[in-house]
Regions:
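Flavin (FAD/FMN)-binding glycine-rich loop and adjacent Rossmann-like elements that form
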Residues: 1-3, 7-229
């Protein structure tokens, strides 16, 4: 046909066609946006230490959206990944012990177990959509390592996808087996696994990285904070 629409996360076709695009965060000065650029806040609290308001190439962290279940007979147990490194997850043990979350105040009824590291949204047939948990300091997101993704080739993207898969399975293995965590916590997590009939041709693991943000093609108008206020 005469027209091609690039509706992908990455925008590779748009870039190959020469379309102008942006990656990362604009600085505060470019559009006079007080909350733009590199900022650290505790939810909607005051701007924290290390904030500069400057532009950077940071994009929102990626993860895998898991299909998890605790239905007996449908659970595929999590296997220890080949490149497992428990030191990546040790801070989680202290978070669990202290009941520490990203919220400024204590979260009433904060669930101890799989729901402390994964946001669990119910699906049909006893399955759950396991996503990164916004209240967890350590969850299924792998921040910063994904920053090259938008402008990299598929060799790098495939390498990162393997790394992210190993990290994700390593996290699940850690919460189910590492003795730095309370036995009750590990026992609850051990109930869960991948759904037997999902992604059976890929080790019951999702095929695609959840790419939340990539290139942003520059169009006729650029929406800024001033349009939303």
């Amino acid at each position: 046909g005469r027209v091609f629409i690039d509706a992908t996360y990455e925008g590779d076709l748009a870039a190959a066609a020469g379309a102008e695009y942006r990656v990362g965060r604009e600085g505060q000065a470019e559009f006079n946006e007080p909350r733009a650029g590199r900022l650290y806040t505790h939810w909607v609290g005051a701007v924290g230490e290390g904030s500069t308001g400057l532009a950077d190439n940071a994009v929102q962290a990626y993860n895998y959206r898991l299909c998890l279940t605790d239905v007996p007979g449908d659970v595929i147990p999590v296997a220890r990944p080949e490149h497992y490194d428990s030191t990546e997850f040790l801070s989680l043990a202290e978070d669990v012990r202290l009941g520490r979350t990203t919220a400024e105040d204590t979260v009433a009824g904060y669930y101890k177990g799989i729901r402390q590291i994964s946001s669990m949204v119910a699906l049909p047939n006893g399955r759950y959509d396991g996503n990164n948990h916004h209240l967890a300091f350590l969850s299924t997101d792998l921040p910063e390592e994904n920053w090259p993704w938008p402008t990299s080739g598929w060799d790098w993207r495939d390498m990162y996808a393997r790394r992210l898969r190993s990290y994700t399975l390593g996290l699940l293995w850690f919460v189910q087996n590492d003795k730095s965590l309370p036995e009750s916590f590990r026992t609850e997590c051990l109930r869960w696994g991948m759904a037997r009939t999902e992604y059976a041709d890929n080790g019951h693991f999702p095929r695609e990285v959840y790419v939340r943000e990539g290139r942003r093609v520059v169009g006729e108008y650029l929406f800024t904070a001033h349009d939303a206020l």
